[in-house]
């Protein structure tokens, strides 16, 4: 199973983002751009990669323990821009404010520690967490892109659950399935 742990967005929030994405779509008419489907939008906290079925109980236990330690996980977004920062643009992101990145970094550190304590093996990403939602992917690094894309989009929601997700890779793109949800307290 190809697994990751994420925060999913409420439908109301996705609808607001969808309106903003529809406004920027024409900018990319002459580019090979893949727009992420609305039903795939989420904030990945930890990517676990391929995990054997026998690891599932320990993964679920880790997520439950971690979610129970966090309350009021408020997610604030500030703009749509190219990503990743400081590198050639390969994506268009909805970026989180610094405070959101800091809070989610704290969540990620605790989650990763708990997974390791419970015997889960995965490739750790020790970079500082940068809260973002991938809206568009470019298959290859592109040369000239439409003028610098920074579109303010102030948007907030209260995350209610930390979710175990499975990624199904298909020729039409990845499809994500929620396997379990754990409430923040």
Feature map (PLM): residue ranges:
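Histidine-dependent nucleotide/RNA phosphoesterase domain, centered on the 2H-phosphoesterase fold
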Residues: 1-185
């Amino acid at each position: 199973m190809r697994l990751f742990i994420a925060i999913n967005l409420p439908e109301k929030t996705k609808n607001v983002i969808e309106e903003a994405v529809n406004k920027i779509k024409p900018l990319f008419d002459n580019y090979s751009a893949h727009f992420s489907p609305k039903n795939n939008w989420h904030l990945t906290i930890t990517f676990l990669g391929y995990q054997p079925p026998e690891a599932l109980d320990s993964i679920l236990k880790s997520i439950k323990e971690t979610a129970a330690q966090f309350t009021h996980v408020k997610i604030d977004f500030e703009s749509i821009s190219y990503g990743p920062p400081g590198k050639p643009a390969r994506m268009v992101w909805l970026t989180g404010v610094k405070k959101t990145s800091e809070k989610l970094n704290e969540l990620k550190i605790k989650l990763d520690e708990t997974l390791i304590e419970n015997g889960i093996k995965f490739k750790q990403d020790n970079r500082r967490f940068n809260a973002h939602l991938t809206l568009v992917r470019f298959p290859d690094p592109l040369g000239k892109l439409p003028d610098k894309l920074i579109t303010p989009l102030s948007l907030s929601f209260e995350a209610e659950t930390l979710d175990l997700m499975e990624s199904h890779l298909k020729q039409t793109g990845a499809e994500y399935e929620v396997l379990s949800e754990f409430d923040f307290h």
